[in-house]
Regions:
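Membrane-anchoring hydrophobic segments
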Residues: 1-20
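Short, surface-exposed polybasic-aromatic patches that bind anionic ligands, especially phosphate groups
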Residues: 8-9, 15, 123, 201-203
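Membrane-interface helix-boundary motifs at transmembrane edges
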Residues: 14-17, 79-93
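Membrane-embedded alpha-helical segments of integral membrane proteins
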Residues: 24-83
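Juxtamembrane/interfacial segments around transmembrane helices
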Residues: 70-81, 111-112, 117, 145-163
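Internal/C-terminal transmembrane anchor helices
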Residues: 87-120
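Alpha-helical transmembrane signal-anchor/signal-peptide segments
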Residues: 114-137
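Extracytosolic and intramembrane catalytic regions of membrane-associated proteins
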Residues: 132-135, 140-203
Length: 203
């Protein structure tokens, strides 16, 4: 190792030590994603699923961490490219990497701003904990054109059953029936057992 290399190593170590928030955010993103997906898988094989509050909360945190990591990655690589203590080839590669990640970062932001509200408007289903035929259940409303309500077994504030137990059609309207003073009449309904087999239907 020559003197030049010996000078480079402390400079690189010092440079990396100033980016601890990048490391924290990156590790948080990896750990949170792995824990969430693993827990989701374990729930799924046991006939359970996360409720909306958990899904949206974790999704929002992961999105924020992705944005932070992309921004910090681009900044980190840019600083590598500007570091004259590094070899020219590494600086060039870092500069290219910074440019690519910056474009990805910008694309994610633009797509989020333009299509994010539209995606949320179509994907969001109001959730209600209700008493249905003497049983506590979690109801989800899909009311884009016609009004559909899916009922799942209630487990706790964070988890529900993954199998639809009752699905109802309340006709056209585009409204949330649980926000009405009086629940509208059900046009048709299908009941399922825990295995997803139809046990009765009407309408």
């Amino acid at each position: 190792m020559d003197i030049t290399d010996e000078k480079k190593i402390p400079a690189v170590k010092k440079f990396l030590s100033t980016n601890r928030w990048y490391k924290v955010n990156f590790m948080a993103l990896i750990v949170l994603t792995v824990i969430y997906k693993l827990t989701e898988y374990l729930l799924n094989i046991n006939g359970l699923a996360f409720r909306s509050a958990v899904v949206y909360s974790v999704g929002a945190v992961i999105y924020i961490l992705i944005i932070a990591v992309l921004f910090q990655s681009a900044r980190l690589l840019y600083r590598f490219a500007a570091n004259k203590g590094l070899e020219q080839a590494k600086r060039v590669i870092s500069g290219i990497g910074s440019a690519v990640i910056s474009l990805v970062f910008a694309a994610v932001l633009v797509i989020s701003v333009i299509y994010g509200p539209l995606f949320l408007a179509f994907s969001y289903k109001p959730e209600h904990v209700v008493e249905k035929e003497g049983k506590k259940m979690v109801a989800y409303v899909n009311s884009f054109l016609d009004v559909f309500v899916d009922y799942y077994d209630y487990v706790n504030p964070f988890v529900r059953g993954s199998q639809v137990r009752i699905d109802e059609w309340l006709g056209s309207g585009g409204y949330d029936p649980f926000e009405k003073d009086r629940m509208p009449g059900v046009k048709s309904a299908t009941y399922y057992n825990e295995e997803g087999n139809v046990i009765k239907a009407f309408g």
